[in-house]
Amino acid sequence: MTEVKKGKINQILGPVVDVRFPSEWLPEINTALELNNHGSKLVLEVSQLVGDNIARCIAMDTTDGLVRGQEVINTEKPIMMPVGKQVLGRMFNVTGDPIDEQPAPTGKRMPIHRPAPSFAEQAEAIEILETGIKVVDLLVPFAKGGKIGLFGGAGVGKTVLMQELIHNIAKNHGGLSVFAGVGERTREGNDLYYEMAESDVLDKTALVFGQMNEPPGARMRVALSGLTMAEEFRDAFGQDVLLFIDNIFRFTQAGSEVSALLGRMPSAVGYQPTLAFEMGQLQERITSTKKGSITSVQAVYVPADDLTDPAPATTFSHLDAKVVLDRAIASLGLYPAISPLQSTSRLLDPLVVGVKHYSVARRVIEILQRFMELQDIIAILGMDELSEEDRQLVMRARKVRNYLSQPSHVAEKFSGQPGLSVKLEDTIEGFRKILDGECDDIHEQHFLYVGKIDDVFEKVAKSK
């Protein structure tokens, strides 16, 4: 029988705990340590070895009730997450303990820290993933096995858009999904769980939560816990996995809190000096290999609507598609409030999406760009001062802008309007008709919150 390697708590500073070990038993960085905190298991993760045989650790749960001199066990391995079929339909915390009042899984576990796949193992992602959301499919096509970021400030609809993508993709996708709730509202996680149960996708989904009320250690590691489950589905089962992370900014924020507690010098805007490294470690593991793919959708909170903030700016470089949500569009009551001019996708290329799709998308972007340039003239001088050509362009641009809106399935209970999914070919055809002037005699109001262009013609026929 192997000897249990024990240390003792030397100091407690909020979520940071110093543990002294005998020199021959000193744990490695990222090792999980365990102790009994008034009947419940508390996991610590080694972050620094500060000398004098002391391991400085981050707690994965509250440290209330800990005392100096308390015994701590070195598990000699990282935090281990349950993986495989046993996690489907279940809800876990950062350390792999169930939080759905069901028994703990007893099967295979994998460490949350591991290297990213090598270049030789990786596969390219160029297949289009249809979402049924017009503005996304037309202007910001998603790659199957790619990385997608939803950028937006507070209250512009990131979580609703993510839940809509879960509804549209996970339902039609047929594969397995993992949802990691990182530092967001517990209520939203609760709602998501019951919505998934109702729509019969829960048995193909694993959920991992480290929400707002958790200490920074849990919020910093829960994205890795969810990713570990997704990697197992990809590597061992050869699956095309969907990984949803809400919200990746909270991962950075937790890293910043931990960094300050560990006494590191802050860098730009008070973020941790290791920001790019930590983000890279996480993002490089979210990739497609020759065995299977991970398609990830990540919500990214943008502090004070500033896209140049180091946290969202660091995330940008890792993504295939960037969906930017705009407060100005949300204030017009147009949802999803996606900015067509700020959002970009690597896949919007005639060689990938085809010439017809590409040319319609470019024309939509051009007309909206010109419309934006004319806004100041319209505001000062009015529409009458525009040339006939520009006036026609503005009328079409307004129709295009309204037609980019769409009723969502997850907001059905608030809006009372049934959600709609639109096929890509119908989306392309609809915008082509508006741009070619086939809808010039229809008022722009009729284009709000409809699906296909045929729905607009039906609306007009009914109103006559």
Curated annotation (Swiss-Prot):
One Pfam family recorded for the sequence: ATP-synt_ab
Compartment(s) of residence: Cell membrane
Catalytic function, reaction form: ATP + H2O + 4 H(+)(in) = ADP + phosphate + 5 H(+)(out)
Enzyme class: translocase
Residues reported to bind ATP: 152-159
GO MF terms held by the record: ATP binding; ATP hydrolysis activity; proton-transporting ATP synthase activity, rotational mechanism
Major localization class: membrane
Keywords: ATP synthesis, ATP-binding, Cell membrane, CF(1), Hydrogen ion transport, Ion transport, Membrane, Nucleotide-binding, Translocase, Transport
GO cellular component terms listed in the entry, alphabetical order: plasma membrane; proton-transporting ATP synthase complex
Keyword Nucleotide-binding: yes
InterPro entries: AAA+_ATPase (IPR003593), ATP-synt_VA_C (IPR055190), ATP_synth_F1_bsu (IPR005722), ATPase_alpha/beta_chains (IPR050053), ATPase_F1/V1/A1_a/bsu_N (IPR004100), ATPase_F1/V1/A1_a/bsu_N_sf (IPR036121), ATPase_F1/V1/A1_a/bsu_nucl-bd (IPR000194), ATPase_F1/V1_b/a_C (IPR024034)
Membrane topology: Peripheral membrane protein
Documented EC number(s): 7.1.2.2
Protein role: Produces ATP from ADP in the presence of a proton gradient across the membrane. The catalytic sites are hosted primarily by the beta subunits.
Family: Belongs to the ATPase alpha/beta chains family.
Record NCBIfam families: atpD
PANTHER family xrefs: ATP SYNTHASE, ATP SYNTHASE SUBUNIT BETA, MITOCHONDRIAL
Subunit description: F-type ATPases have 2 components, CF(1) - the catalytic core - and CF(0) - the membrane proton channel. CF(1) has five subunits: alpha(3), beta(3), gamma(1), delta(1), epsilon(1). CF(0) has three main subunits: a(1), b(2) and c(9-12). The alpha and beta chains form an alternating ring which encloses part of the gamma chain. CF(1) is attached to CF(0) by a central stalk formed by the gamma and epsilon chains, while a peripheral stalk is formed by the delta and b chains.
The protein's name in its UniProt record: ATP synthase subunit beta
Lineage of source species: Bacteria, Bacillati, Mycoplasmatota, Mycoplasmoidales, Mycoplasmoidaceae
